[in-house]
Amino acid sequence: MKTRVRGLTLLLGSLAVAVCVAADANMGTWKLNEAKSKLNPNGPKNHTVTYAAAGDSVKVTVEGTDSSGKTYRSEWTGKFDGKEYAVTGDAMSDMRSYKRIDDRTLEFTGTKGGKVTITGRVEVSADGKTRTVTATGTDAQGNKGTSTAVYDKQ
């Protein structure tokens, strides 16, 4: 009996986490709308971001082509709790944190070698069809810049 209760409790807890993650406005695949975005001339092309459930965390995968035509892919898995989690494949950051502001808004910070390299805000529209990312950062050459990237839900 105790085993059944524990099993049921674990199952319900897992389902609750899955429902919360699935209900998150950021979840899904987002494609960059270059025409609506204000990006650095050296910014990404053919850029896609996917948010997917990964247990009780979220996995964010970024894929695309840079301005020189080189393809890239980065991954981050963590929680929207303001704590830093490792990033792979990102030239600007090796750690990133996301903090939930409300149901449709996140703030993020990326660091490289312990120094902040990028900060920004992610906002999903009320209808859930558009995602806008405003970011300020410093690249490897020390150049500072601000961008606004608009994404369409796929």
Where are these regions (language model features)?
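Hydrophobic h-region of N-terminal signal peptides that target proteins for export
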Residues: G13-A22
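Bacterial N-terminal signal peptides that target proteins for export
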Residues: M1-L12
